[in-house]
């Protein structure tokens, strides 16, 4: 039977003496009455045995202890049989069973290896051997950790922590031979220390940044093909594009590199929009997905679309030189058919309202793209007619662009009855410097309001599947066109 240190149980040989009548006047039995047993034993009322009982007067037992005039002599006589709790006489040694290192304070016995704080050399040798065999993938699975914990007599937490520290050490020494990942496959739950999370997240961040910069630095071709993938794939947590399609800097880079290199265009998107960030956002939405500079970018991988014509970006930017003829514009997109457009024209009113507020239709068919360019072109300083807007679909079965500005279209989709001279302005190219005139004032105001709606809409609409985004807005726009 073991007792914690400092709580002294008298040996059985001595207890026989203390079982005398309680109020005898003898010195031996005096301090051992029931009310004094704990007081002189050194546990609760006095830190050391006899320190209070024999030196301080107390009404309970003072009359039974007849001391001489010298209390020190009496105390010495008393200690001759009581002894200190740390002074184990031969008689006491046999009956005191507590462990000298306070084993009762822990749930493990003293010699248990699970109680050990430090890993032994054998344990670390085993772990190092496993690590050397798995340098390509130093992430033990849960089963391997349990096996190693049994072999090394360590806990599962200790094994996980050891591997986290080992990976960090190797990384600091530039001996990393594996590709870092966020967590190991078996999801080390709370057992793992935070060091491992920080350890593996940091190398991930530069790689993510590199991935995000890849499409921008690659010029307009990659931008054209990556436009729909960005929105259809899972949203990357680090990317700024997910907030409002593409960030300002993103769009400026792509417009400066891709468009200005191959087809010289005077201004950038951010600089050419006088109405500020709202119209810049409109420019971003339509711009990156219709790069006019690419004569024939490959079809979009995700939607199977044909390359958009050069109308969308040229409407938003200041007047361009005459564009190359749009290639292969007669092929029909695969996501919807003309039959669907013809049969489901009852949604036109809903589609018209939602089409302008929808955030960045990523990969619309050519028709939807031109419509978007038309409806969003108004905030730009140049009037929205450009040579590329003249007839994006020569000989196509769907309506060509100039018809969108006639009276039946705009009263239904915006709140304007007329657009001033825009109706009668079918010329191939307006003057480059024509700023927004008086007929643009109401238009600017309303489009800016719609831009505010745009800024809020992406957050709501992104919760839906990204494929719907790629489908719906151009789909409804084209349905609207079939009604005219």
Curated annotation (Swiss-Prot):
Keywords: DNA-binding, Homeobox, Nucleus, Phosphoprotein, Sensory transduction, Transcription, Vision
Residue ranges, annotated region (Disordered): 176-393, 424-443
Record field: compositional bias (Basic and acidic residues): 203-212, 249-265
Residues bearing PTM Phosphoserine: 273, 465
PROSITE patterns membership: HOMEOBOX_1 (PS00027), HOMEOBOX_2 (PS50071)
SUPFAM superfamilies per UniProt: Homeodomain-like (SSF46689)
DNA-binding region: 112-174
Gene name of the encoded protein: Irx5
Protein name: Iroquois-class homeodomain protein IRX-5
Acidic residues compositional bias, start-end: 185-202
Subcellular location: Nucleus
